């Protein structure tokens, strides 16, 4: 039986386009892992991470979980989000969070920022990792040729195996999420 993540009920912009969620309650089976990635259509760091985010999505989906891409900037439309997904080859579900319900629930500060959730034996959700997707960027404008550390991949693998994660938070590098007034 799926359990609900009670603090996260999201009321989102309605959309006829498949893949853009109208409403979603985060829920999962015991031992399942879900990933939330905060993103923006115009953040160059988030866009550079798109291929890795898609690879993580496929891996999480193959393990029975979900990856949700959350667009956080005010003024984004379903059309913007769908065009962005198409342009970058992203196939996961997209959430438009212009009211920052998710941003506030997870205290997200930049895009891209990832949250890995593991559902325990009772189906109760627990954040097991939050922060950097990988180490492709040391800081804005300071990009490696390729990532050498894959923090979200490692957290997902550890969560699936119910193993401890050595570092549950890594300060993310990216475009600052402007707080709602």
Can you say where each PLM-predicted feature lies in the sequence?
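Short active-site neighborhood of thiol/selenol oxidoreductases, capturing the structured segment around
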Residues: 29-44, 156
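Second-shell loop/turn segments in exported
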Residues: 40-42, 69-74, 139-145
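Thiol/selenol-based redox catalytic cores and closely related redox-interacting motifs
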Residues: 99-181
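Structural microenvironment flanking redox-active thiols in thiol-disulfide oxidoreductases
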Residues: 47-87, 98-105
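The canonical Cys-X-X-Cys-His
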Residues: 43-46, 114
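Sec-dependent N-terminal signal peptides
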Residues: 4-12
């Amino acid at each position: 039986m799926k359990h609900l993540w009670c603090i996260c009920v999201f009321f989102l912009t309605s959309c006829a386009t498949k893949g853009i969620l109208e409403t979603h309650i985060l829920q999962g089976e015991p031992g399942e892992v879900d990933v939330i990635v905060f993103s923006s259509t115009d953040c160059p760091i988030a866009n550079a991470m798109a291929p890795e985010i898609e690879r993580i999505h496929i891996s999480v989906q193959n393990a029975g979980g979900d990856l949700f891409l959350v667009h956080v900037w005010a003024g984004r439309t379903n059309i913007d989000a769908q065009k962005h997904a198409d342009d970058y080859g992203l196939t996961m579900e997209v959430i438009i969070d212009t009211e920052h319900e998710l941003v506030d629930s997870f205290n997200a500060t930049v895009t891209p920022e990832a949250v890995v959730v593991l559902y325990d034996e009772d189906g109760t959700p627990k954040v097991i990792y939050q922060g950097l997707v990988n180490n492709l960027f040391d800081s804005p404008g300071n990009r490696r040729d390729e990532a050498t550390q894959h923090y979200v991949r490692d957290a997902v693998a550890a969560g699936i195996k119910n193993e401890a994660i050595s570092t549950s938070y890594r300060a993310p590098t990216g475009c600052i999420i402007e707080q709602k007034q």
